[in-house]
């Protein structure tokens, strides 16, 4: 089995986690108490969904997940929510005091106290796996817990489970919408850790998600529930190939192999189609070609950056539902002829496709329409550097005046860490620039060598 353990850190991680597990349960027909009426064989360990759920002797399905927060309110919502019976009580770990939007508190003072307990729980989950494939980490980079404790956990996971892949789903700060003044600090510090300790990071930002909700679903004032359900659809599409058997299945490690050309360049842009309300879907024929076109629309991106300003290095298309390879090939061929979608010149083909025959599921009473087929795109594009440089710029403005720095230093952090993290991100911006640069001048140099021999 290729089990995956999900780790949900801080408010953002836990709330997106709730939406994801709600959707997984609906997709697999698992009830909120963990029972699965359709599954007659108790202890049948070969079912594909066992990558995400473990089955107890009593036939109860328990998510392979850990919820961690440094303060209890969000965890208590899980403990009292609809799915309270789904989780093992030990899988939900909460501290007493908050990280207060401070990376240093999440990483050094308060996070330190809880991290061993969390790793112990993760170890228990890992021991239950026959072939652990990796970790999915859900967090926000702008808060205190998601950034600080998130980085600390990733560092420790690298030590304990070096070879296992770690994918992170990070809610990154948006250009206009901010929940904290110190977001740029937390974000730069945690991105510094993500660079080193994750194999692949999927960037999502709230502003882009708000826009998608407003534009495509006509929700005037989207709530976090609306956003999280959207995120859950994306994550469900990415993980569908692990949880169902399909025609062209894509493994977690396969993502990395196909999307990450250089270890540092692993920040992904995602989009999903069709994002459409029930009233509209009734009147539209959403063919494979149409949904494939719409995932490349800049307006549908889940991160605020414009892919037309960058070049694609690699692109994964995960289809689900009523889709056949022939249609996919035709749709991709059409995309390739479009001049708007530019690939770097050293990566001519650049598309990886996966098909899963399980149709997309929607939450009853949710915003999305039930459709026959859907596609999720994950792209590695140089345009994501836009989002990085935006955060860096905000960081520079505050750091030049050393504003708010005393809160971090007071929690036992050294000022040097700020500049170290910032330099690392400056190097990353440079890396993206070089990757997207034309390689034409390189050809001239090779010819010179030819004359020497």
Curated annotation (Swiss-Prot):
Catalytic residues of the enzyme: 254
Site keyed Involved in polymerization: positions: 453
Pfam families, sorted: Tubulin (PF00091), Tubulin_C (PF03953)
InterPro entries assigned to the protein according to its UniProt record, in alphabetical order: Alpha_tubulin, Tub_FtsZ_C, Tubulin, Tubulin/FtsZ-like_C, Tubulin/FtsZ_2-layer-sand-dom, Tubulin/FtsZ_GTPase_sf, Tubulin_C, Tubulin_CS
N6-acetyllysine sites (modified residues): 40
Keyword Mitochondrion in record: no
UniProt binding sites for GTP: 11, 71, 144-145, 179, 206, 228
Name used for this protein in its record: Tubulin alpha-2 chain
